[in-house]
C-alpha cells in the first residue's frame, strides 16, 4: 500500500490531525498545515473498486465526516475515527484533483479559501472549485505525485 501526503493544491498545505498526534483521539478534526512529519502520512485501503478508506498511518484511524452520516450536510467537519463502515468511504480522484465522499460531496478547507491559514479545519461540501482540489504526493518529495490506488 502506497504511503502519501494529502496536499491542498492551491496553498501547498497538508492534511493533518489537529495537534499532530501520532495517536489522535476519535473525532480529532483534520486541518490544513504547512508542516511535514510522519504523523501526517496516509494510505488508501481500497474496499470496492474506486471506494476505500483513507487511513492515518500512525494511528490506523480513518477519515470520516463527523457523526459518520451517509449524506452529511455541507460544512460537516472531517475527523479521524477508528470505525470502518460504508459512510467512511471516499474516492481519490487523480484527474480532477479532489476527494469525494461516497455521499457525493467533497473535502474542502472550511470557508473555501485558496490560501487558508495553518490549522484551518476541513469540511465536506458539495461545491466544486479550484480551492477544493487536493493532490497526493510522496512523503520523500512533496512535489512528486503518487498513485494511491497502487
Swiss-Prot record:
<dbReference type="GO" id="GO:0030246">
    <property type="term" value="F:carbohydrate binding"/>
</dbReference>
<feature type="binding site">
    <location>
        <position position="19"/>
    </location>
    <ligand>
        <name>D-galactose 1</name>
    </ligand>
</feature>
<feature type="binding site">
    <location>
        <position position="111"/>
    </location>
    <ligand>
        <name>D-galactose 3</name>
    </ligand>
</feature>
<keyword id="KW-0430">Lectin</keyword>
<feature type="binding site">
    <location>
        <begin position="127"/>
        <end position="129"/>
    </location>
    <ligand>
        <name>D-galactose 3</name>
    </ligand>
</feature>
<feature type="binding site">
    <location>
        <position position="27"/>
    </location>
    <ligand>
        <name>D-galactose 2</name>
    </ligand>
</feature>
<feature type="glycosylation site" description="N-linked (GlcNAc...) asparagine">
    <location>
        <position position="26"/>
    </location>
</feature>
<comment type="subunit">
    <text>Monomer in solution. Homodimer in solution. Exists as a monomer in solution when a low concentration (0.001 mg/ml) of it is present. Homodimers start to appear at a concentration of 0.01 mg/ml and tetramers at a concentration of 0.1 mg/ml.</text>
</comment>
<feature type="binding site">
    <location>
        <position position="75"/>
    </location>
    <ligand>
        <name>D-galactose 3</name>
    </ligand>
</feature>
<feature type="binding site">
    <location>
        <begin position="83"/>
        <end position="85"/>
    </location>
    <ligand>
        <name>D-galactose 2</name>
    </ligand>
</feature>
<feature type="binding site">
    <location>
        <position position="64"/>
    </location>
    <ligand>
        <name>D-galactose 2</name>
    </ligand>
</feature>
<feature type="binding site">
    <location>
        <position position="16"/>
    </location>
    <ligand>
        <name>D-galactose 1</name>
    </ligand>
</feature>
<feature type="binding site">
    <location>
        <position position="67"/>
    </location>
    <ligand>
        <name>D-galactose 2</name>
    </ligand>
</feature>
<feature type="glycosylation site" description="N-linked (GlcNAc...) asparagine">
    <location>
        <position position="118"/>
    </location>
</feature>
<keyword id="KW-0325">Glycoprotein</keyword>
<feature type="glycosylation site" description="N-linked (GlcNAc...) asparagine">
    <location>
        <position position="74"/>
    </location>
</feature>
<feature type="binding site">
    <location>
        <position position="119"/>
    </location>
    <ligand>
        <name>D-galactose 1</name>
    </ligand>
</feature>
<feature type="binding site">
    <location>
        <position position="108"/>
    </location>
    <ligand>
        <name>D-galactose 3</name>
    </ligand>
</feature>
<keyword id="KW-0348">Hemagglutinin</keyword>
<comment type="function">
    <text>Galactose-binding lectin. Binds both alpha and beta anomer of galactose (Gal), but has a stronger interaction with the glycans having alpha Gal at the non-reducing end and binds beta Gal weakly only in highly branched glycans. Has high affinity to Galalpha1-4Galbeta1-4GlcNAc. Binds N-acetyl-2-deoxy-2-amino-galactose (2-deoxy-GalNAc). Binds N-acetylgalactosamine (GalNAc). Binds porcine stomach mucin (PSM) with high affinity. Binds galactosamine. Binds laminin, bovine submaxillary mucin (BSM), fibronectin, type I collagen and gelatin with a decreasing affinity, respectively.</text>
</comment>
<feature type="binding site">
    <location>
        <begin position="35"/>
        <end position="37"/>
    </location>
    <ligand>
        <name>D-galactose 1</name>
    </ligand>
</feature>
<protein>
    <recommendedName>
        <fullName>Galactose-binding lectin</fullName>
    </recommendedName>
</protein>
